[in-house]
Amino acid sequence: MKYGISTLSIIPVRQLPSDTAEMTTQLLFGEHFKILEVRKKWSKVLISHDDYKGWVCNKQITIIDEEEYQKLEKETATISTDILDIIGADINQPIVMGSILPSYKSDHALINNKMYKFTGNSTQGFSQKKKLIENALIYLNAPYLWGGRSPFGIDCSGFTQLIYRLQGVKLPRDAYQQSEIGNTLSFIEE
């Protein structure tokens, strides 16, 4: 089994192995995954945090070993909380709100023994309930993008998944999956 991680700001994940195929979700910086199948230009991946499958262009994959993958599986994720932050190893690059900072220590993330200096705000674990609303309002007027997961283009279930991620809660990717978890509340007296 091969493993990978996103070291780019945003990577499109497609339904089929083609540049013109539907984008079903996006990988944000620091999100890791299993590589299920490798073809000439594309790899089929299983995203760790939500078990979502799709195709990613091979040029956009950073390979990690199983030991690093297992370490990432066990650690409590540190998450960037600003609309746009800067992270850099050799060069600085923007990362969006909700990106993961693997093996985060004080001001840097670590991927494949390479340090990525981080300048911005982050959170780890559960946040106060009022932060949920504050974070949600940041996405006000964000454009709709099918499969999107950033303030620059987002869909309904991507929005819900990211807002709760910032609260330390893992949710599945699609709305139908999200509706199947949690507790049903009755708002009408019976």
Kindly give the residue locations of the regions a language model identified:
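Boundary regions of SH3-family modules and the immediately adjacent low-complexity/disordered segments
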Residues: 1-2, 18, 25, 29-32, ...
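Single-stranded RNA-binding regions, centering on S1/OB-family and related RNA-binding modules
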Residues: 5
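Short, conserved secondary-structure segments in the cores of folded domains
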Residues: 23, 91, 183-187
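Active-site nucleophilic cysteine motif
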Residues: 136, 150-167
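Short, flexible active-site loops
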Residues: 139-149, 178
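...with weaker cross-activation on analogous glycine-rich loops/strands in unrelated enzymes
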Residues: 169-190
